[in-house]
């Protein structure tokens, strides 16, 4: 991953970590007690097969009412010193602020919703740059989900998807990247991703960041499905949303089920990690999942 104008170009990329309900939190993946007690969420992170450290981080939380699920994933930029800590601090800060704010519920007004996410990302940025150690950089994606509403904010190229049980998948985030900038100018995805510096990100949290206002998108799910937040260590292996939906359906069909016949989010999360590693594991891989049942 290469943030533009941060040094020249920066590549992002220790052990393997998986955290699901019932297991202990680690430095790279953190669930609050309330989130860990639920059976409809899961979170997993893996170093991959090519890197020496895991610079991804994820944090899951639930508000006091139990109605708002918060999923956050951050991806550190490896050529910044402190990237690992940056991702951890940013993800925890965003999760904690959103979970605390959700005690009043998601704002109904669009402008207020955007303001909420802008404050969240600003607080994450400030927490990173005010640290005592080296200041790193990272991407950041945060999602708040209720039964009838999903709101997503992102900076960089960590992505959020909605995979309904029936119907077309929806990508709920837009990358801040050179490839996306080229697509905005009319290039096809294939052409843009072949370009020099295609994976350079144009916005980030932390070191030298000048604009930390996220893109914000809202969606109203109408049926059962899966909300996924993931680092590019996963989606780079399946960039097409339609292909990604087929992968999800296959993993769901193979996952362990509970007493009600519902696929285990933990099993699906582990399947996504395994898929990326089977494709070469070129980067750290992190996923956060929520299952919505009608």
What is each stretch, according to the model?
Residues 3-294:
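PP2C/PPM-type serine/threonine phosphatase catalytic domain
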């Amino acid at each position: 991953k290469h943030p533009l104008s941060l040094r020249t170009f920066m590549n992002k990329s220790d052990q393997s970590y998986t955290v699901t309900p019932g297991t202990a939190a680690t430095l790279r993946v953190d669930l609050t007690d309330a989130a860990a007690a639920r059976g409809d969420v899961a979170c997993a992170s893996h170093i991959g097969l090519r890197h020496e450290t895991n610079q991804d981080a994820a944090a899951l939380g639930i508000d006091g009412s139990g109605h708002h699920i918060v999923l956050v994933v951050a991806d550190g930029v490896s050529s910044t010193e402190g990237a690992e800590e940056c991702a951890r601090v940013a993800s925890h800060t965003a999760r904690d602020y959103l979970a605390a704010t959700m005690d009043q519920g998601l704002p109904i007004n669009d402008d207020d919703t955007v303001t909420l996410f802008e404050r969240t990302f600003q607080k994450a940025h400030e927490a990173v740059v005010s640290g005592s150690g080296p200041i790193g950089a990272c991407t950041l994606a945060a999602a708040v989900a209720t039964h009838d509403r999903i709101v997503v904010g992102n900076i960089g190229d960590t992505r959020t998807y909605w995979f309904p049980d029936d119907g077309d998948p929806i990508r709920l985030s837009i990358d801040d990247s050179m490839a996306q900038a080229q697509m905005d100018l009319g290039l096809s995805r294939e052409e843009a991703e072949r370009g020099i510096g295609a994976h350079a990100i144009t916005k980030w949290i932390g070191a030298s960041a000048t604009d930390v206002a996220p893109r914000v998108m809202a969606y109203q799910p109408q049926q059962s499905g899966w909300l996924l937040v993931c680092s590019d260590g996963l989606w780079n292996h399946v960039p097409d949303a339609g292909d990604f939906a087929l992968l999800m359906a296959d993993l769901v069909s193979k996952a362990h089920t509970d007493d009600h016949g519902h696929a285990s989010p933990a099993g699906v999360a582990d399947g996504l990690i395994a898929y990326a590693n089977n494709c070469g594991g070129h980067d750290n891989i992190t996923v956060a999942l929520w299952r919505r049942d009608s």
